[in-house]
């Protein structure tokens, strides 16, 4: 039943997109047509959505979905260390959920993690994965104003800025991860450098951020496809259809990372346009790669080889595109239907008990996904997407 209703929803979204196309060419009808389109969409969504997940495309409906997924994950313990990047991604999304949840439960959950870890990062000094948890620490610092919550991260970043790694960016050898040499790293570390710069104003952190982001982008960004290779090992690899290998979640890490970095940098920041340029190029490309069912897939350029949904990539893209609409970077006429289709797909991947499904396991390239696969970083992506959906629906 859910599959049939979901197909009906996608059909209606296609009609919705036709309405937006009409609006773009008939400016005098924009407001009344937009109102009619929203009413149509709300009606269709209420009829088709899983009643055990979200009852409508409303602010409160999205919050209900987020709560279910967050609560399921908290109730189901994970085996990774709390300082691990997997947990860091979860906590980044959980912190955004905590801001809108309306109670202290989720802040208490995150604070308990910080206390357990003594507010420290992972054990590898230069490894971006071990910095990801700093996103949570900065949000807790903003909430409670206690500098000890970010002091270990400040100490680590100060040392790195003074004694940066000099290795090249080839993903090879035991020190290959001492710099941001794989695209996932753009979510793991640069986001924290941007947040630390935001709360301290110390230009040592922004200078390091700009220098290393520029180096990574020059090395991994494909200027023709407007996508990032996962790392140097994929420069000469190809999919079954002969196209380049661009990993769904890998580029999701980048796109979510860019959205977070741009959130943190001042509007008049001298190098802001460097980040904006890549963000806008990726947004246009990613919008063109969404499947008719609303999902993005494990392989961006060969979805036929990986036809199943992949919700960690889809969550990050939904987050980044909704963020772009909310912050005036992306026109609603083009991108709102894409975001709504993406969110609808995500909630149809949630089991009635709140488990998020269709998450590709840990890896570095496109792999097969089955429905019952779940991972904590996928939940983080879902919560990030939901946080921007709430803002979008609040406008």
Feature locations, PLM:
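Bacterial N-terminal signal peptides
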Residues: 34-44
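Extended ligand-binding groove/face enriched in aromatic
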Residues: 102, 107-111, 119-235, 240-244, ...
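CBM-like carbohydrate-recognition segments
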Residues: 50-88, 97-116, 120-152, 156-159, ...
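Bacterial N-terminal signal peptides that target proteins for export
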Residues: 5, 22-35
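Extended ligand-binding clefts on enzyme/binding-domain cores
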Residues: 183-187, 191-300, 307-318, 330-359, ...
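Short, Lys/Arg-enriched N-terminal segments with co-localized hydrophobic residues
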Residues: 10-22
């Amino acid at each position: 039943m859910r599959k049939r209703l979901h197909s009906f929803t996608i059909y209606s979204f296609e009609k919705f997109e036709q309405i937006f196309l009409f609006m773009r060419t008939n400016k005098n009808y924009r407001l009344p047509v937009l109102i009619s389109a929203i009413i149509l969409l709300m009606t269709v969504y209420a009829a088709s959505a899983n009643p055990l997940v979200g009852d409508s495309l409303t602010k409160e409906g999205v919050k209900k979905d987020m709560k279910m997924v967050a609560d399921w994950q908290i109730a189901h313990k994970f085996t990774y260390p709390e300082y691990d990047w997997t947990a860091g991604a979860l906590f980044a999304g959980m912190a955004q959920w905590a801001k809108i949840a309306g109670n202290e439960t989720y802040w208490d959950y995150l604070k308990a993690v910080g206390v357990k870890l003594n507010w420290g990062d992972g054990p590898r000094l230069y490894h971006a994965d071990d910095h990801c948890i700093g996103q949570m620490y900065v949000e807790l610092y903003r909430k409670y104003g206690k500098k000890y919550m970010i002091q270990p991260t400040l100490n680590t970043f100060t040392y790195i800025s003074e004694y940066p790694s000099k290795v090249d960016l080839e993903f090879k050898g035991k020190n290959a991860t001492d710099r941001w040499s794989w695209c996932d790293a753009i979510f793991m570390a640069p986001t924290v450098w941007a947040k630390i710069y935001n709360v301290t104003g110390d230009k040592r952190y922004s200078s390091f951020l700009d220098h290393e982001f520029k180096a990574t982008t020059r090395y991994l960004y494909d200027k023709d496809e407007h996508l990032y290779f996962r790392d140097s090992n994929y420069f000469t690899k190809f999919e079954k259809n002969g196209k380049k290998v661009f990993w769904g979640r890998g580029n999701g890490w980048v796109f979510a990372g860019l959205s977070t970095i741009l959130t943190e940098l001042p509007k008049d920041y001298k190098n802001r346009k460097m980040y904006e340029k890549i963000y806008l190029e990726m947004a246009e490309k990613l919008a063109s790669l969404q499947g008719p069912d609303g999902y993005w897939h494990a392989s961006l350029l060969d979805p036929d080889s990986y036809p199943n949904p992949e919700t960690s990539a889809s969550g990050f893209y939904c987050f980044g595109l909704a963020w772009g609409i909310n912050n005036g970077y992306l026109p609603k006429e083009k991108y709102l239907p894409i975001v709504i289709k993406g969110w609808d797909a995500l909630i149809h991947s949630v089991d009635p008990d709140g488990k998020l499904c269709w998450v590709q396991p840990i890896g570095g390239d496109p792999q097969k996904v089955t429905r019952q696969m779940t991972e904590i970083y996928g939940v983080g992506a879902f919560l990030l997407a939901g946080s921007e959906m709430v803002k979008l629906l609040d406008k």
